Amino acid sequence: MLLAVPAEHTEGERRVALIPDAVKKLVRAGLTVQVESGAGKHAGFADSLYEEAGAGITTDRGSLLKGADIVLRVRKPSVDEVSSLKQGAIHVSYLDPYNEGALVDKLTEAGVTSISMEMIPRTTRAQKMDALSSQANLAGYVMVIQAASKLDRILPMMMTPAGTLSPAKVFVIGAGVAGLQAIATAKRLGA
């Protein structure tokens, strides 16, 4: 079974659907993994790391998609790209199915089974595939770091010979995954 990881071409996208450590596990399980050259570059993973993990590297995106039994990517494919997928293939990515009806219809017409990552329920059973919670967790952390860099003061309480600086007060709106991580990060930074 051939699993394909195409490079993301959306401007500003730095994520990759599969990292080299996961490639090792999939290859050990008997899958053949092909990665488009440069797919992991913006996430800090060189092609050589994928090769060391057991993946093949290709520069031919069309052949990669045509031959794949499973396609893993972060962003949705273009409607035009769906015709490159073979009938019976499985496509896994964020799809935005409520707003991308034409794309969902095209995938269905092409006989491609689609898994929309944002529709996977947040349950214990599906936890290993819950990409939204992972992304929200990172977002909560990053937002506090970015907010701290914009403050005209420091977050933790500091006692110096010149006086004491009281800790910053942080107000987080929301208590979902991102909000809870933001609260935890702000507390760890001393707010």
Where are these regions (language model features)?
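Hydrophobic beta-strand scaffold residues
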Residues: V33, I57, S114-I115
